[in-house]
Amino acid sequence: MDYEFKKNTLDGTYHANFSMGHEAMGRWLVEDVAKDTELLAELYKQIAAVKNTQDEWKLSGKVMTLVLTDQEVIVQENALFENSEEEFEEDIHIYDDECISVCGLEDFETMLQSWEAFIRRF
């Protein structure tokens, strides 16, 4: 999972560009986490709690839902969770890479640390 963080110096907005297949992770960072250091602290706490357990932790944000397990992290648009029981029509296609991302727990923790270091600099 490759990523790059940028800040627009004109309007102060943050951008998180992720490699193909992980675009939803960038949306989640920018739209649901942003500069919320209290949320980052809670995420680190929950990562430690799920390591080496069968536990799962879920956080529903404004736009995305995050699911932590001992092996992986899933970030998915809230609308997909709401419609997960429904079948979509065959002619309707969702560009999944923008709606859902999956990565390993350790990669996720490293990415969060990078994001936190980035937002603290600006």
Swiss-Prot record:
Q: Name the residues that span the membrane.
A: none
Which Pfam families would you find in this protein's record? Answer: UPF0231
- Source organism superkingdom: Bacteria
Q: Which HAMAP family match?
A: UPF0231 (MF_01053)
Q: Which family does it belong to?
A: Belongs to the UPF0231 family.
The protein's name is UPF0231 protein VSAL_I2591
UniProt organism field: Aliivibrio salmonicida (strain LFI1238) (Vibrio salmonicida (strain LFI1238))
The upper taxonomy is:
Bacteria, Pseudomonadati, Pseudomonadota, Gammaproteobacteria, Vibrionales
